[in-house]
Amino acid sequence: MLDICLLGTGGMQPLPYRWLTSMMARCDGSNLLIDCGEGTQIALKEKGWSPKPVDVICFTHYHADHISGLPGFLLTMGNAERTEPVLLVGPKGLERVVGALRTIAPELPFPLVVKERTEPREKFQAGPYVVDAFRVNHRVTCYGYRITIPRNGKFDVERARAQEIPQKFWSRLQKGETIEHEGRTLTPDMVLGEKRRGISVTYTTDTRPVPAIAEYAADNDLFICEGMYGEKEKIANARENKHMMFQEAAKLGKEANPREMWLTHYSPSLMHPEEYLNEIREIFPKIKTARDGWSAELGFDED
């Protein structure tokens, strides 16, 4: 099971009714946060989720509305008596930016592990999450993220017995472990069938449409995408500032065909994103204009 919460849906500045865009994932007791702008910890408090289990924080880029909430968030995690390391992930320059922000949060009861992304496409694993980072097209270096909870194939009892694999190792092999036993190397592929569809969520914001977005969001359970402007006359603003129109996002959704799509990162001038919903659903029917606090409980497909 993967729980997703879109903590905020705003871009540029927080508003009384709209926090800045940020997404939290929960799986197997480990939380992953993407972006941490001003007020993110308040949005998390309103949701009722704890900051203590946040093991990973990914940043799309280093504009203030995506990272300025980090010092307070880290201090709150410390006040919650967290002591385990926290992994910070983002484009090149993260160590410098975090170092500057930590001048107002110098003492933490847990270490920070900083990993900078430098390639156009990178993959890493953090706890239960397999994370793909892919570069998008903003005014500064910016990444989108796809998080996946993989799922192994079914356990094949007959294959296990035929290879005389002791039953005491079956559960460990099913969990993906490799075992050395009496001179033999027992591997999961010896007893598991083909991998099954996992759970995937793609999150991207602050970008013009690029092919990589639809590629990574293809057939996802949930696709969370920037929709900065709904008004068609704002297309010049979107192009100049490297943001995305509702209609452009909907076209990416049509191409990727996720099971569900949420728009986020609305311009502060956009009071009622839902006014454009009928228009963009003509492009991609499964698109929604998200609101702060929207959640989804995503599970594996039934066999």
Short names for language-model regions:
Residues 1-47, 85, 145-147, 193-204, ...:
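Conserved beta-strand hairpin/beta-sheet module of binuclear metal-dependent hydrolase folds
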Residues 5, 89, 113-118, 132-134, ...:
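General small-molecule cofactor/ligand-binding pocket signal
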Residues 16, 129-203, 207-216, 222-224:
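Active-site-proximal loop/helix segment associated with metal-binding centers of metalloenzymes
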Residues 34-37, 54-62, 90-91, 202-207, ...:
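Active-site neighborhood of phospho(di)ester-bond hydrolases with catalytic His/Asp-centered motifs
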Residues 38-89, 113-121:
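Active-site metal-binding motif and surrounding structural segment of the metallo-beta-lactamase
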Residues 69-77, 98-101, 271-279:
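Metal-dependent catalytic neighborhoods of phosphoester/phosphodiester hydrolases
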Residues 96-105, 114-119:
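A gly/proline- and charged-residue-enriched helix-loop-helix capping module
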Residues 119-121, 210-303:
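Binuclear metal-ion centers of metallo-dependent hydrolases, dominated by the metallo-beta-lactamase
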